[in-house]
Amino acid sequence: MAGLVSGAPVWAAPATASAIAPPKGPLQEAVLAGGCFWCLEHDLETLPGVVEAVSGYSGGHLDNPTYGQVSTEQTGHQEAVLVRFDPKRISFPTLLRSYWRNVDPLDGGGQFCDRGDSYRPVIFTSSKVQQAQAEASLKAAAAELHRPTSAIRVQIKPLQRFWPGEGYHQHYAVRNSVKYNYYRWACGRDRRLDAIWGKRARSGAAWSGNAPQVAGSKPSSKPNQNPNQKPRKS
């Protein structure tokens, strides 16, 4: 898709980050928020068909936000991940299935041990098609969990602009694996995902139960620690 929404660029690099080139050729983009962007970036960038995942910020009113500013909960941004993907290998609805099963859709006050609006789950959509597919995926997720759609706390919002995060946040799970693995364990992310989704946690498998078929979902050809003691992403 084109990198424009209402005439404004979807992506915009802050002065402290390298510019991220817009997609070329057949690549498409998705911007998703699901709590700690270290985790969501790592969960999605390994999917077949995903070319790149970038940690950053979206949804707020401040240009060029820094991590410190977003952490104040005063800018309106969420930690988000920009995913570039090949639609011939993975469709947006298929990508969304993996997204849903990597978040707690019943929690709108943050995610796991991370609390606050900057950690709330959001699907940012850049077209009417993406919006329709996101809404269908919400209904499918609710059906799989045997919950009413009113219980789902993932927001679906129009994408205005994505700001790449600071360089030290990018690919954090790979570059700082010991710290990342401890943080993820201490936060209880995977334990909660397993409790919600069961065997389908973290997977992109087809929707189960009474979930409706989402159009375009088939791609072409130790105990938990006190959350207040979690490592800070400084």
What are these regions, as identified by a protein language model?
Residues 2-234:
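Flexible coil/turn and secondary-structure edge motifs
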